[in-house]
């Protein structure tokens, strides 16, 4: 899979001076009362935007935000992003707010651009064609530009107009710095890791991570499992799990994976104790189980202290760690300890530490460990599909070197 990482043209392989450059960014940021609450994705886009500006290109930015389902929704307008980008770039980012995205305002704004100017188009998902990858909208986007740059790793696993369709109608399609960085870290971790290589998987469902578990068992030295998905594995081992989250139809699969780990000589670590409660609530009374078994009427909501210690020690011995998914219900303080301990062990480790986006990225940033990690992926779904060994359509569509 290294081919994905290194055989695509990048922004440095082309001349952008005086050219109109359409850049697909990932500005799908959380908003509260019209204010951006997490700027991680904006910061990630800046190197590519600045490079094109400095080289005298005309920068036309596009992105989706939320799920407007093909119609304009004021609360999902990219206006707050344009405002914040103007501040971060020290330059006005023009925002021709066309509900049809590529409307008269946008076309006129692009026509009047000077070298080094930046404009941001309206939310691409205001158009219903976007998620269906329909030719009409792809052609409209392409008509604005000479060059297309994909720098949205977070949507690289989606074949939409603004990620894949547009590449058919623009002569040159390359990747930006953010996608390069993502592929460098994730690609090296999966294909050429420094060993011991450990992967930690958490989150609620086994079904979300089936292919990831299967693929990683071919690559890792140790696989650590926590979070809601661990109870299906504990059940498969023959333990009682009370009223914990269980995917009945995945018990056999969990047994197969336990067997596969043995065959491959991979150390598979599962919880040895749990933090449980009678209800799923912030004020629920937490108990710690003595071993793997959870008694009737109780549900597991976090890994227990013995497990946290076991997992943290394992992390300390690693040279490469990839983590995707929290160890428990980290939004409730009583059930956040497992996630905190694992994050702390990674932050203190000398290893290359990679956080696979989504909830784990949120947890790490919330806990203040963000700057202690080697790389925090900007794409939850995309990084998962990458770890499954799948080709990402948004990257496959770019020009080869």
Swiss-Prot record:
SUPFAM superfamilies: Phosphoglycerate kinase
GO terms for biological process, alphabetical: gluconeogenesis; glycolytic process
Residues bound to ATP: 209, 300, 331, 357-360
Binding site for substrate: 26-28, 41, 64-67, 125, 158
Substrates-to-products reaction catalysed: (2R)-3-phosphoglycerate + ATP = (2R)-3-phospho-glyceroyl phosphate + ADP
Listed GO MF terms: ADP binding; ATP binding; phosphoglycerate kinase activity
EC numbers: 2.7.2.3
Biochemical pathway: Carbohydrate degradation; glycolysis; pyruvate from D-glyceraldehyde 3-phosphate: step 2/5
Annotated CDD domains: Phosphoglycerate_kinase (cd00318)
UniProt key word ATP-binding: yes
Places the protein is found: Cytoplasm
Alphabetical UniProt keywords: ATP-binding, Cytoplasm, Glycolysis, Kinase, Nucleotide-binding, Transferase
Coarse class of the protein's main subcellular location: cytoplasm
Any one GO CC term of the record: cytosol
Top-rank taxon, per record: Bacteria
PANTHER family with a match to the protein in the record: PHOSPHOGLYCERATE KINASE, PHOSPHOGLYCERATE KINASE 1, CHLOROPLASTIC-RELATED
Record note on quaternary structure: Monomer.
Assigned protein family: Belongs to the phosphoglycerate kinase family.
Name by which UniProt lists this protein: Phosphoglycerate kinase
Organism lineage string: Bacteria, Bacillati, Bacillota, Clostridia, Eubacteriales
Gene that this sequence comes from: pgk
């Amino acid at each position: 899979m290294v081919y994905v990482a290194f055989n695509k043209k990048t922004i440095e392989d082309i001349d952008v001076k005086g050219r109109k450059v359409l850049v697909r960014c990932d500005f799908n940021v959380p908003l509260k009362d019209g204010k951006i609450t997490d700027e991680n994705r904006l910061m990630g886009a800046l190197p590519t935007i600045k490079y094109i500006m400095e080289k005298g290109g005309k920068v036309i930015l596009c992105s989706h935000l939320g799920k407007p389902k093909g119609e304009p929704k004021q609360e999902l307008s990219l206006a707050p992003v344009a405002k914040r980008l103007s501040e971060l770039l020290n330059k006005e980012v023009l925002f021709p707010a066309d509900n049809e995205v590529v409307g008269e305002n946008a076309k006129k704004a692009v026509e009047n651009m000077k070298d080094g100017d930046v404009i941001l188009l309206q939310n691409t998902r205001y158009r219903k064609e976007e998620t269906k990858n329909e030719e009409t909208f792809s052609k409209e986007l392409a008509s604005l530009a000479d060059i297309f740059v994909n720098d949205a790793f977070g949507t690289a696993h989606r074949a939409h107009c603004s990620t894949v369709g547009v590449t058919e109608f623009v002569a040159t399609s390359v990747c930006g710095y953010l996608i390069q960085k993502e592929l460098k870290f994730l690609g090296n971790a999966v294909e050429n890791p420094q060993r011991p290589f450990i992967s930690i998987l958490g989150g609620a469902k086994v079904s979300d991570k089936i292919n990831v578990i299967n693929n990683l068992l071919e690559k890792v030295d140790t696989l650590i499992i926590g979070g809601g998905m661990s109870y299906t594995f504990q059940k498969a081992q023959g333990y009682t799990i009370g009223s914990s989250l269980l995917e009945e139809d995945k018990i056999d699969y969990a047994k197969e994976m336990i067997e596969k780990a043995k065959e491959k000589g991979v150390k598979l670590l599962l919880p040895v104790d749990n933090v449980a409660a009678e209800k799923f609530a912030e004020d629920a009374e937490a108990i710690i189980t003595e071993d793997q078994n959870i008694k009737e009427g109780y549900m597991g909501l976090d890994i227990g202290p013995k497990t946290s210690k076991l997992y943290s020690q394992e992390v300390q011995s690693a040279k490469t760690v990839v983590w995707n998914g929290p160890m428990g219900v980290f939004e409730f303080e009583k059930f956040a300890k497992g996630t905190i301990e694992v994050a702390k062990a990674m932050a203190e480790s000398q290893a290359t530490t990679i956080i696979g986006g989504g909830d784990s990225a949120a947890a790490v940033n919330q806990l203040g460990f963000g700057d202690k990690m080697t790389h925090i992926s900007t794409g939850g779904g995309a990084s998962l599909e990458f770890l499954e060994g799948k080709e990402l359509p948004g990257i496959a569509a770019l020009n080869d070197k």
